[in-house]
Amino acid sequence: FKILFSIFFVLLFETSVSYSEETKIKIGVLAPLSGEDASLGKQILNSIRMALIDIKDNNIEIYPKDTRSDPDMTLRSALEFEKMGISLVIGPVFHKNLLFLDKVKSITFLSLTNKTLDLHKNIISSGINSSSQLNTIKKFLETSEIKKTIFLIPNLNYDLEIKKGIKESKIKFFKQYNYDIDPTKLTKQIEKITNYGIRKQNLLDEISRVENSDDPNKEKIIENLEKKYTLGNVKFDSVIITDFDESLKSVITSLLYTDVSPKNKYIITLNQWFDESLLKEQNLQPIYYPSINKQNLDEFTNKFFKKFNYKPNYLSLLS
């Protein structure tokens, strides 16, 4: 959170506004303080209060206003900030609430969204976006000398954001596939991508060939072949899956079913915030993904819990 305030100070200097020691710096906060996302809004405010204590600057005053996770309410609150003479605002949290903020041109908004498509000129995205993550993945591919990478992108509302990140990072890849997250369709799609049917048939054909051969060791050869699921390799050495949670697990499980294992192919995904449920799935390991510093995350979580007696949502870390 200290980094966030550093950005604000840079923005303050860039606007050529002079502050004396007695001048109070007013910073607005747009967060969902009511409605179904109110608990997240509360966590964001608590995180900002912790940051203020850490930076020990009594000249900063925070003014929170409710967005109710609604674009119209967000605009009304932003216009109230404008009347107060506030020019810098943390928030809003969600991309949908940025819709009308180009009408408040006197304010710079440091939004917590990780989406960067079609942002208004007065909005800065401070979330962990796809471009920054893909740049990190690109370095990993280069240092690991991984040559043939495929992208698996779900047909969801952020697929254009991912494709923009791929273009900006100039990451080299072999092929790119979109897939339907519907479990009844997913496995068939992964089978096609991995040529599972051909590789499975290759195995059956080889078993049949050996059975009909005069090889004196054919029983042993057949025994070894029957331990396999497929015969023949896939045309890639790494998979980047731009998915999360249960949907991500379903994709990796489908890859395992088609005899593509993390033990012989690199399975790479986006930041999973150290998802414990994912880490506990031993058959899905190893998985590679970019992340924030684990030690810093643990320190933030412990500090937050000690002060407020509950664990924070990781989105509040960005504030």
Where are these regions (language model features)?
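Short, well-structured alpha-helical segments in soluble
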Residues: 71-87, 139-140, 189-198, 202, ...
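Glycine-rich, charge-decorated loop segments at or immediately adjacent to ligand/cofactor-binding or catalytic sites
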Residues: 120-124, 185-189, 273-285
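Signal peptide-proximal N-terminal region
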Residues: 45-66
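Short beta->alpha junction loops
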Residues: 63-73, 77, 127-128, 176-184
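Extracytoplasmic ligand/sensor domains, especially the bilobed periplasmic-binding protein
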Residues: 88-152, 156-171
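Extracellular/periplasmic periplasmic-binding protein-like sensory domains
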Residues: 171, 194-219, 234, 238, ...
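Classical Sec-dependent N-terminal signal peptides that target proteins to the secretory pathway
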Residues: 1-20, 30
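Extracytoplasmic "Venus flytrap"
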Residues: 28-46, 65
